[in-house]
């Protein structure tokens, strides 16, 4: 029999242990031996190993099949928590890089980031991040996340200002990841011309409405790459990398088919030569579920929730908003009751 304060991890206290000892002196009650969880499970293992009786085996994930709603309740907090974790990891890297470039890590500003991290950790409290706190808590959370983000953005702006090259028409592309990768970046530029890397190789570009997409290739891990813009009367003619035939789309990597509801009926991977979707299955299926559990509306999703599911099929807009050598974007909108859902599918 397990006893003690479980919620909060307090365990047993002196009074509980004394009460257990006194129970041994009450006539008629079975004698109970105090032990530990580790000792209990060691004996249980020996008992199960030596028994000839059938022992039930749990097959699957070991978790309490309860309070499933905490995985999705208050989605804003969950999204901002992860977004800020990643943002602060990048901001910390920037402060270290800036300190190294200045010749001293003592110049790496950490005080403001420490303040922000403490706010992030505060909002990871076990009743805040699951979405099970009272309304006023989440009003405070919005203010906290705004302050958290402001700190990191200021660090990024300081880093950019102190590391930017002074030469005109020159950009530095930083890669905070731990692996080398290609980056598709947006540069505010409306002039005609072309871009090159530091070796003079011409980079792929795509003109947007008020900016240019540039593919910076092989940006080193935890490092940077410099790209240059060369103005000229006429930029290099763009070659489209995408083919669109109604709801059939071909990219350099995929063949995609969409139905009249905006759902994928085919996704073929050209690189590996395989169908991603099983026969008869669909992708990009938007679903709505009734959220009225019997108890604990912020905590629970009842096991029968899938019986009250509706697909969103009223597609009201389908438009190609970007199409060029580097990027294709399809904008779709749906209507469901009094709600509107918009989606940009970028390939």
Task: Label every model-predicted segment.
Residues 1-165, 174-176, 198:
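Active-site and substrate-binding clefts of carbohydrate-active enzymes
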Residues 107-114, 122-347:
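Catalytic and substrate-binding regions of extracellular carbohydrate-active enzymes
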């Amino acid at each position: 029999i397990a006893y003690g304060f479980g919620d909060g991890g307090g365990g047993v206290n002196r009074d509980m242990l004394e009460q257990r000892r006194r129970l041994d002196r009450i006539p008629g009650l079975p004698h109970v031996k105090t032990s530990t969880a580790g000792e209990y499970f060691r004996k249980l293992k020996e008992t199960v190993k030596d028994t000839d009786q059938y022992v039930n085996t749990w097959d699957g994930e070991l978790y309490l099949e309860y309070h499933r709603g905490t995985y999705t309740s208050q989605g804003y907090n969950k999204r901002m928590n992860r977004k800020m974790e990643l943002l602060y990891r990048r901001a910390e890297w920037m402060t270290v890089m800036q300190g190294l470039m200045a010749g001293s890590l003592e110049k790496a500003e950490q005080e403001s980031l420490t303040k922000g991290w403490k706010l992030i950790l505060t909002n990871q409290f076990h009743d805040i991040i699951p979405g099970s706190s009272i309304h006023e808590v989440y009003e405070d959370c919005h203010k906290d996340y705004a302050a958290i983000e402001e700190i990191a953005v200021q660090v990024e702006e300081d880093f950019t200002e102190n590391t930017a090259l002074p030469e005109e028409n020159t950009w530095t592309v930083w890669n905070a990841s731990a692996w080398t990768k290609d980056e598709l970046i947006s540069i505010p530029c409306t002039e005609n011309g072309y871009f090159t890397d530091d070796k003079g190789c011409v980079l792929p570009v795509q003109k947007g409405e008020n900016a240019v997409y540039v593919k910076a290739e092989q940006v080193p891990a935890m490092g940077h790459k410099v790209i240059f813009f060369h103005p000229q009367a006429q930029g290099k003619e763009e070659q489209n990398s995408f083919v669109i035939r109604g709801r059939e789309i071909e990219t350099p990597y995929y063949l995609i088919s969409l139905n009249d509801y905006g759902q994928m009926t085919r996704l073929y991977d050209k690189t590996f030569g395989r169908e991603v979707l099983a026969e008869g299955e669909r992708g990009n299926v938007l679903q709505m579920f009734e959220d009225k559990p019997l108890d604990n509306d912020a905590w629970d999703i009842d096991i029968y929730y899938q019986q009250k599911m509706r697909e969103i099929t009223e597609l009201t807009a389908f438009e190609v908003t970007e199409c060029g050598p580097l990027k294709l974007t399809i904008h779709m909108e749906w209507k469901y009751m009094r709600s509107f859902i918009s989606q940009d599918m970028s390939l």
